[in-house]
Amino acid sequence: MAEFETIIGLEVHAQLNTESKIFSTSATKFGSPPNSQTNPVCLGLPGALPVLNEFALEKAIMAGLAFGCDITLFTKFDRKNYFYPDLPKGYQISQFDKPICTGGGVTFTIKGEDSARYVRLTRIHLEEDAGKLIHSADPNIPQSYVDLNRAGTPLIEIVSEPDMRSSDEAYYYLNSLKSVLKYIRVSDCNMEEGSLRCDANVSIRPKGSDKFGTRVEIKNLNSFKAVKAAIDYEVEWQKEMALEGKTFQQQTKLWDSVANKTVTMRTKEMSHDYRYFPDPDLPVIVLQKETVESVRSKLPELPNERKNRFVEKLGLPKYDAEVLTAEREVADYFEDALKVSGDAKKTSNWVKDEILGIVNKENITISEFSVSARRIGELVKLIADGKISGKIAKTVFEELLTSDKDAETIVTEKNLIVVRDDKEIERIVDEAIANNQDAVTKYKSGKDRALGAIVGYVMKVSKGKADPELVNQMLLEKLGPLPPKS
């Protein structure tokens, strides 16, 4: 059977989180009543002239710098001409041959792999969003309504080279891209609200060939999982067509998430179908290098840079660093807690396991989490200083969730400080040995897990307050080192 290679390129549209639209002063707030955020410019009324939003331009430059793009110092806007009910002017203001950013790329790592992968970018350009069609849910009333609140919202379109060879690569590419955009705070990347949208261009070719096959563009991809599923389905469909000797036209398809298949929408238009030409209402943009460098100075530490620092400077495992740096707010929370606790690994464990566990379960952001980074740092410091055990820390944490008290106050009020009285601990250890002779026998026969039962007895009697390190030390002195297994 013939073997094929998959070729994938992605086009990502990210709404820029500006207060107003790209060419007018209308607001961009999501969820407002239909057609309540419009003005003559975004309605396409005669005589209404566009004026570029400087903040949108700056955010586009920042995105380009974050992905290592070259910034075009001489750029312009073009009219992309087509008819659709949600496009009141009959054209979209976009960029054709002089995009604001060219080149660059996205670095990502597939889960379970050590080496990073890199996908080149073709360009990033600025454009305005279209409105939104709302179709009647009643099949007996075949009507559609137009909401132009979204029309004119600033977008960047991030176009990749066809460098991806699997749906997994596409999935992790998108995750990395989203992480960077959120880190630099140019977009909230909320797919449910439509502020991040993706189209996938998919083709196949015989392995070893350098000629591209017929390309299919897939739209209506409302999640990264949908992107992965749509690519997998489309690749199998194209392979079947090739093996049966059938051909097909370049076309645009929709992803049907109910039927889990791609459905043909239309034959694909080419760029000449849009009759691009420079927008006569907008002057060309001549950027100064100083302007670009000013934007560069505002760039925060990016996810990969931060991840590497967590591994190299803080000594965290790679997995911990990946979890903590996936979102800027989580990484900030961790570092704020670490400033108080002074113990990177213990702080990492608490943030990624306990705190993110609650955040994910309750479907909230870490900024909405009820316990501040400072209070978590104080709790971890008590553990790191040996004042409380991990088990007691979880009891304290439960109270932190519902109380404004700090960890040390809770520990003091409940008398939870670890017992360091050697004589008292030795008394409990002797009692544990006397009452757990079966475990002692197993330990002396080489079964190291048996020691856990004795330690557990000590912790139970001391109500978790005995110093675990001291308990283990005393047990080893009294029982001797673990003998070799016979």
Swiss-Prot record:
InterPro entries: Asn/Gln-tRNA_amidoTrfase_suB/E (IPR017959), Asn/Gln-tRNA_Trfase_suB/E_cat (IPR006075), Asn/Gln_amidotransferase (IPR018027), Asn/Gln_tRNA_amidoTrase-B-like (IPR003789), GatB (IPR004413), GatB_C_1 (IPR042114), GatB_Yqey_C_2 (IPR023168), Gln-tRNA_amidoTrfase_suB_CS (IPR017958). GO terms for biological process: glutaminyl-tRNAGln biosynthesis via transamidation; translation. It is an enzyme of class 6 (ligase). One of its GO terms (molecular function) is asparaginyl-tRNA synthase (glutamine-hydrolyzing) activity. Gene3D superfamilies: 1.10.10.410, GatB domain, N-terminal subdomain (1.10.150.380). It holds the Pfam family GatB_N. The keyword Nucleotide-binding applies. Keywords: ATP-binding, Ligase, Nucleotide-binding, Protein biosynthesis. Its EC number is 6.3.5.-. It comes from the Bacteria. It catalyses: L-glutamyl-tRNA(Gln) + L-glutamine + ATP + H2O = L-glutaminyl-tRNA(Gln) + L-glutamate + ADP + phosphate + H(+); L-aspartyl-tRNA(Asn) + L-glutamine + ATP + H2O = L-asparaginyl-tRNA(Asn) + L-glutamate + ADP + phosphate + 2 H(+). The keyword Lipoprotein does not apply. PANTHER family: GLUTAMYL-TRNA GLN AMIDOTRANSFERASE SUBUNIT B MITOCHONDRIAL AND PROKARYOTIC PET112-RELATED (PTHR11659), GLUTAMYL-TRNA(GLN) AMIDOTRANSFERASE SUBUNIT B, MITOCHONDRIAL (PTHR11659:SF0). Heterotrimer of A, B and C subunits. Belongs to the GatB/GatE family. GatB subfamily. Allows the formation of correctly charged Asn-tRNA(Asn) or Gln-tRNA(Gln) through the transamidation of misacylated Asp-tRNA(Asn) or Glu-tRNA(Gln) in organisms which lack either or both of asparaginyl-tRNA or glutaminyl-tRNA synthetases. The reaction takes place in the presence of glutamine and ATP through an activated phospho-Asp-tRNA(Asn) or phospho-Glu-tRNA(Gln). This is Aspartyl/glutamyl-tRNA(Asn/Gln) amidotransferase subunit B.
